[in-house]
């Protein structure tokens, strides 16, 4: 499984509203409707069907205390290998359902734990979107994008996957940084 935190530039610009990212992540919806297929909605830890408006509202209003030029959210891409996709199911629908479950039970819990702040996936404000096509890549196409807030769901803690893991105590009981290498390899 390839897991990557996207940079904050171009379509993934993250210092303002997430509306452009939410809009971009819907690019497959019109194509799927034209083909007679159901668009894949946004999802989070608890729900399978979340409107783009709600995603934008929740992420954009979860930024208490962040500076103007500070990232407000991050975008994570999760892409399974061909073998992993086969294990997820025979149809695209089965694979999409398995991918959502994988994100809920593996990716986001490990992401939360990676901050060493006693967080769980339920503490995160995140929204995922399954995509079935990748026009610029060869090979298997199914992948997911996850928009995750820079702040925990209760606006209480600032968390960034871009901080470097130090393994040292910074203040109080919290350890500094986020160990991306350990998270990516799990």
Which role does the model predict for each range below?
Residues 1-186:
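N-terminal nicking endonuclease/strand-transfer module with a His-rich metal-binding environment
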């Amino acid at each position: 499984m390839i897991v990557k935190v996207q940079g904050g530039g171009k379509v993934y610009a993250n210092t303002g509203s997430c509306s452009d990212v939410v809009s971009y992540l819907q690019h497959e919806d019109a194509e799927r409707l034209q083909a007679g297929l159901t668009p894949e909605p946004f999802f989070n830890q608890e729900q399978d069907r979340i409107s783009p408006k709600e995603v934008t509202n929740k992420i954009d209003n979860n930024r208490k205390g962040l500076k103007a030029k500070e990232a407000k959210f991050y975008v994570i891409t999760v892409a399974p290998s061909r073998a992993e996709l086969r294990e997820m199911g025979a149809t695209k629908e089965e694979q999409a359902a398995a991918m959502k479950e994988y994100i809920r039970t593996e990716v986001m819990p490990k992401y939360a734990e990676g901050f060493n702040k006693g967080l769980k996936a339920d503490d995160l404000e995140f929204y995922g979107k399954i995509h079935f096509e990748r026009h610029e890549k060869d090979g298997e196409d199914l992948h997911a994008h996850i928009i995750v807030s820079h702040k925990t769901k209760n606006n209480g803690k600032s968390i960034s996957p871009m901080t470097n893991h130090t393994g040292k105590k910074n203040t109080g009981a919290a350890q500094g940084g986020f160990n991306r290498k350990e998270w990516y390899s799990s």
